[in-house]
Structure formats: structure tokens, C-alpha cells
Amino acid sequence: MLFLYACSRETEGPEKPVPDLLTIPPGFPEMPFPKDNELTVQRWQLGKKLFYDPVLSVDGTLSCASCHQASLAFADDKAFSPGVMSRPGVRNAPSLANVGYHPYYLREGSVPTLEMQVLVPIQEQNEFAHDILTIAKVLKEDSV
């Protein structure tokens, strides 16, 4: 993903996939990962940091965790999850449980990959109302 590539440091060494980072419950298949975005410790840590970081919203007030609450199975209990500047949302934030197994994203199935789906709330005017180029610049300057 261009977004994550722009956030990386050039001095970092190559990342190695870490297949045992996740414990797959009995009866579940292996989690599919794109060849160009395999799970690594660094990507896991970056994803967790970004999930809780309000820098992804244009006014710095919302993070993914604002609506995908851990105490609610990473879902929201509101019919329409609110966006930045108290803008009314247009959809409910669904649970993220087992999201890596989903064949498509958003209720209508309009987004084919998880890597593409993460861009939707960031750019949606009623959610984070931000743009990827600005976020990439801010994150590249971040010390983490």
C-alpha cells in the first residue's frame, strides 16, 4: 500500500513475515494475507498504533477505536457512528471480529480488500474527512 510505504523509514531493514504472530483457533483456516502485505511484527505494531491514533481524522478528534470499541467486540452501539465535527454518520461501525476472513467490505460489498477498506473512513467526509497524502506526510514526520 502506498499509504503505509510512505510512512516507513528508509533506514529500516527488510521485514520478515511472522506466521506465528496470530494464534488460529481450532477449526479456522489460515488467515489469508496478500503477498505484498504479509503480517510482520512491525506492521502489527503500526496497525495497532494507527487504530488508536486520532491523527487519521482531519480535526484530530477521532480514531478507528472511537467507533470500533474493544468493549463492544470492536463495534459501535450507535445506529449511525458519528464523524468529525459532530457530523452525522451514514452507517454503523460493524464488528471487526474475524474481519480478515471477509470476502468483501462495507455492507454493500463495494470494497474488495481490507487494504482498500481502511481508506474509506479516512476519506469519507462524514467520518474522518481527511486525505491520504496529508496523512502520509504527517506520519512520515512522526517519530514512531
Residue ranges and their predicted role:
Residues 1-5:
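Sec-dependent bacterial lipoprotein signal peptides
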Residues 7-144:
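Periplasmic c-type cytochrome electron-transfer domains
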